Amino acid sequence: MIQGIHYLDSLLDEMAVKWPDNRIVNIVCHGHSVPSGYFATPFVNTFDAYPHLLHKMIKERFPFAVVNVIVTAKGGENSPHGADRFEKDVLTHNPDVLIIDYCLNDRFCGLAASRMAWEQMIKQSLERDIKVILCTPTWEKAYFEQNENWKMLVQHTEQVRELADYYSVGLADSFAAYERHVKDVMDLSKYLSHVNHPSREGHMLVAQEIAKYFIAR
């Protein structure tokens, strides 16, 4: 079962504690160019990308918490490569929460290889009592073409939803958020900064999806 909005309750209780009894909380965003902050490649717009937007949202809700949002994402990377460096680059930060976002690039390594890599990272995290939130993909120009790339993106979206359900972890359904908002405004271009990267508005949709797990105390 996909975890609901109370998934992080015990951590949120700790985040409401004031100095001198509070502690450092680490949230790690692991993935590809989107959490890295790439807009029109090679331009990296760190402060309009969803890890930073999420950080600001969390601090507004938890003003006494010492929270680090750490980005270990790498442009152009897929999940098998992300899994290869997972222990060295991610687990060394001792995350309380891990956010994984690889679907856009995983289309080109295939569903089976992608699933194996996501499962490896999920299992390694759960073994260490790390809370995990999986992200479905943001949309890109393949939406306009409804081509094979789009069909693959839909398949990877479904696979990530299945993984969140199977491992009983959190889900930030960016794909569904895009679907809702594009239908409302009838304009995907508002949420794109490049052919395959979100604009600030697109990143905000992802940040809001993740932030639903960080309910103010």
Language-model region placement:
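Short, solvent-exposed loop/turn segments at secondary-structure boundaries
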Residues: 39-45, 109-113, 145-149
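Internal alpha/beta domain cores that form substrate/cofactor-binding pockets in large enzymes
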Residues: 26-28, 59, 64-93, 105-135
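Extracytoplasmic/secreted envelope proteins and their assembly/folding machinery
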Residues: 9-12, 51, 55, 83, ...
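Catalytic His-Asp segment of secreted/periplasmic serine-dependent ester chemistry enzymes
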Residues: 2, 12, 138-217
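Solvent-exposed loop/turn segments at secondary-structure junctions
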Residues: 33-36, 75-79, 104-109, 138-142, ...
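Cell-envelope and extracellular/periplasmic
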Residues: 2, 34, 42, 71-77, ...
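Alpha-helical structural signal in soluble globular domains
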Residues: 53-61, 89, 120, 124, ...
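Serine-esterase "nucleophile elbow" of acetyl-processing enzymes
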Residues: 2-72, 85-94
